[in-house]
């Protein structure tokens, strides 16, 4: 049996752009994708902390070091510039793989620069 587990997460990123006229996706700074173990074209779930919206799309690699977090296409209607979002990828793991699995959680600052990378989330903690 396989279980769906968190693979990687970019926690509390700031939306820098929303482009309704671009073909759908989310453009993310390649440095952030690498740090979270998320690949270009990978399916991701996104949570908007400002309005509670949850949706799925796929990633496009943005310029390294740019801090870009741009929602494109229809997803641009679900965010506004400066909204705080969480970007998550998931992996399918067999029961024996689960015990050794550690998701990558990338904590960013207000400019989407990496503050820290952790493999766990302390309960009831604001990061």
Swiss-Prot record:
It comes from Neisseria meningitidis serogroup A / serotype 4A (strain DSM 15465 / Z2491). Pathway: Cofactor biosynthesis; (R)-pantothenate biosynthesis; beta-alanine from L-aspartate: step 1/1. Transmembrane segments: none annotated. This is Aspartate 1-decarboxylase. Binds 1 pyruvoyl group covalently per subunit. It comes from the Bacteria. Heterooctamer of four alpha and four beta subunits. Catalyzes the pyruvoyl-dependent decarboxylation of aspartate to produce beta-alanine.
